[in-house]
């Protein structure tokens, strides 16, 4: 069995609502008959592969993917918009992903999308999603964990999640305070050159900061009934953690050594390759890595090839493809 813990879904009725918007996220019809979705920064091609779950199942079958954990794409930035604007659309998503999961219980499990600009509403929607709709947890924005102080603002969600026994997926995404003022122009790319490379570096550095917050602080200590996984192999942290260890030893940093804390959360392998996966296994352990593809934004074939080509033994490979995800979702 193969379980994809990082896959996205945009219900058809939600896509229709996004076509009526003119602030990110919004869907624009292109002259050649295609569509693109405008994000807080940049745009992506938007197609039927986001919404057509019958076609998605056929796509999965062709590649041997048995199950997907579905979430609304955090990169779209809707969950950071003002709550009166975002909450109705996010509730629509939650109802729809629950319906898809009920219709195909062996193929899909849903995560709730939450309106983070109003924490009371976010907590209420998490409870509704998990107790009434049968969702497994929620997707949370990476930027809410860039510092311990920012993470503290999400304690009400973790307290509610701990009582419910949920799974949280931390995915690249902005906080509500990072949303531009209403009516302001969409921000330009911050990169003057080599944008494709610098954007990848920027995203992975941001994920690493969030991973560091959760690994090296005591934020998790009171939430033993919550499971968490980070996107994208924890960002650049696997490459840098040995330097952190060196700094801690040579400069007398108090507390646990960084390498002793790497078992405190799981990471998925979305969008990375075989060599990156091998490094992450050496740092986190194969028991802390789950398969993730970022379908349909990134290539499922790419991730499957990375897991196949990585220099891993069969037991570790199967743990990444199936066993670790099963334990997270069944805790």
Where are each of the predicted segments found?
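Active-site gating/metal-coordination segments in enzymes
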Residues: 66-210
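A general structural motif
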Residues: 208-211, 248-250, 269-273
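Catalytic metal-binding/acid-base residues of hydrolase active sites
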Residues: 8, 144, 173-175, 215, ...
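Mid-to-C-terminal alpha-helical segments outside catalytic/metal-binding sites
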Residues: 1-5, 11-67, 95-103, 124-128, ...
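Hydrophobic faces of well-ordered beta-strands that scaffold small-molecule active sites
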Residues: 3-5, 68-70, 109-112, 138-140, ...
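Glycine-enriched alpha-helix->loop->beta-strand junction motifs that scaffold or abut catalytic
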Residues: 133-137, 162-167, 223-225, 261-265, ...
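Aromatic-lined glycan-binding groove of carbohydrate-active enzymes
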Residues: 215-260
């Amino acid at each position: 069995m193969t379980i994809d813990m990082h896959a996205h879904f945009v219900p058809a009725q939600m896509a229709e609502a996004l076509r009526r918007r003119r602030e990110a996220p919004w869907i624009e019809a292109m002259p050649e008959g295609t569509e693109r979705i405008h994000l807080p920064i940049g745009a992506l091609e938007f197609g039927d592969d986001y919404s057509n779950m019958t076609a998605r199942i056929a796509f999965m079958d062709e590649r041997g993917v048995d199950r997907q954990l579905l979430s609304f794409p955090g990169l779209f930035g809707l969950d950071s918009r003002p709550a009166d604007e975002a909450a109705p659309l996010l509730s629509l998503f939650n109802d729809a992903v629950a319906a898809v999961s009920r219709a195909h219980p062996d193929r899909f499990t849903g995560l709730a999308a939450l309106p983070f600009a109003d924490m009371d509403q976010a907590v209420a929607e998490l409870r509704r999603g998990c107790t009434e709709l049968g969702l497994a947890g929620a997707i949370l924005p990476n930027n809410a964990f860039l510092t311990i102080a920012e993470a503290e603002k999400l304690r009400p969600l973790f307290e509610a999640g701990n009582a419910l026994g949920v799974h949280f997926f931390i995915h690249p995404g902005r906080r509500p305070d990072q949303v531009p003022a209403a009516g302001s122009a969409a921000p330009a790319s911050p990169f003057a050159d080599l944008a494709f490379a610098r954007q990848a570096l920027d995203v992975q550095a941001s994920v690493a900061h969030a991973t560091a917050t959760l690994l090296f602080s005591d934020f998790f200590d009171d939430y033993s009934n919550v499971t968490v996984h980070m996107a994208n192999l924890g960002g650049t942290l696997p490459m840098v953690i040995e330097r952190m260890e060196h700094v801690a030893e040579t400069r007398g940093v108090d507390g646990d050594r960084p390498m002793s804390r790497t078992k405190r959360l799981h990471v998925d392998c979305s969008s990375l390759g075989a060599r990156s996966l091998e490094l992450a296994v050496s740092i986190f352990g194969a028991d802390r890595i789950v398969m993730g593809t970022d379908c349909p934004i990134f290539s499922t074939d790419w991730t499957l090839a990375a897991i196949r080509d990585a220099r891993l033994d069969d037991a570790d490979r199967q743990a990444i493809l199936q066993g670790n995800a099963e334990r997270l979702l069944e805790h």
